[in-house]
Amino acid sequence: MLLDIDVEVFDGDDHVPVIEILTLVARGRHDWLPTTLDALRAEAFVAKLHAAKLKAPALKDWAMKASEAAADRSSSAVPPIGGPRSARVTSGNVGLAADDLGKPAVLVVENRIGDGGFVRAMAVALNDERVVHALRKRWLKFCHSGGTGQMADLAIDECRDFSVLVRVAMLIDSDRPDAATPSPNEDKVRKARRGGVPHIHMFTWRMVENYVPFRVWEGHFRHKEVKVKDLRGWIPQQRGYRHLKHHFVGKDGKMPSPLMPEGLTLSEADFHELGPDVVAELRQVLAMLHEIL
C-alpha cells in the first residue's frame, strides 16, 4: 500500500508503531515516497534510534536509500502520474495504522481454491510481480465465501478487522446469461458498498470460468476435443456468457479442481486470445489489489 506519512509522527511519544511502519516499508511490504525534506526527517529519526543502541540495520540502510531516491525524484523533470491512491498516516492514527498495515490484505472470493488460483495464475501471466510476491509472502489472503449468497456479509465482516486503513476487496461473478441482462448480484454489490467494503470488482462476463484460457480447458478435457473446439468457435460475446460447467460436464457434473492446474505457465497472449477486452479487465482487478496491498 502506498503511504502518505505525516513526518510529525517522528516527534511523538510512542516510537513503536512508527518503527513498525518503517520496517514494513523497508521490507517492501508497503511504499512511501517521501519528499527530500521528509526523507531527511526519517533518516534523522532512524539515526536517533541507532544512537539509542536500538539495532535496526535494515532501517538504517532503507533511510539512506530513501533520501537518495527522494533526491532523484525531486530532480526529475517528469512527476509520476497515476498509480494507487495513498493512505494517510498521522500522529493521530499511527498506532491503529500500524496494526492495520501489519495484517494481510483480504480478497473475498466465492471459492478460495478456484478463484484464488485464477488470480494467482493471472498475476503471473500478466507479470504483476507485486501481487505475485504478496501472495507468496501471504501478505494477501483469499477469504472463501462458498458462493455469492453471503459474500457481501462476509466482506463487510472482514472490514471490521481493520480500524483506519480498510484493506479489503471483493471479486464477484456477474452470473449474467447475456450482455443485456442485469446481474442478479447487483444487490450484493450495493450491500457490500453500503457496509463499507471499499473495493469491489464484478466480472463483466458470467463467471471466472469464462476468463480461463483455452489452453487450460484443452488440458482438463483432452477427451472432449469437440467441446473445446466449440468453445473456440464462439465469438467472445457468446462465449463470455455461456455456463461452461453445463457445456463441459452438464448441470450435475463436476468441474476440474483446481481450476488452474499447477505447473501450467500462461502468458498475456493466452488471456488476450479470449477477447480484446479481457486483459484490460484483468488488469483492473490487479489494480484493485494494489489499492489494498
Which residues fall in each region the model found?
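RecA-like P-loop NTPase motor core
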Residues: A63-R176
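Extracytoplasmic/secreted cell-surface and envelope-processing proteins
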Residues: D178-T181
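N-terminal extension/subdomain marker
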Residues: M1-S86
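Exposed alpha-helical structural elements
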Residues: P17-E20, A58, M207, D230, ...
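Generic structural signal for hydrophobic core residues of well-folded globular domains
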Residues: M122-L126, R215-V216, H220, L289
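Terminal low-complexity/disordered tails
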Residues: G240-L293
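Activity-critical C-terminal alpha-helical subdomain
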Residues: S183-P261
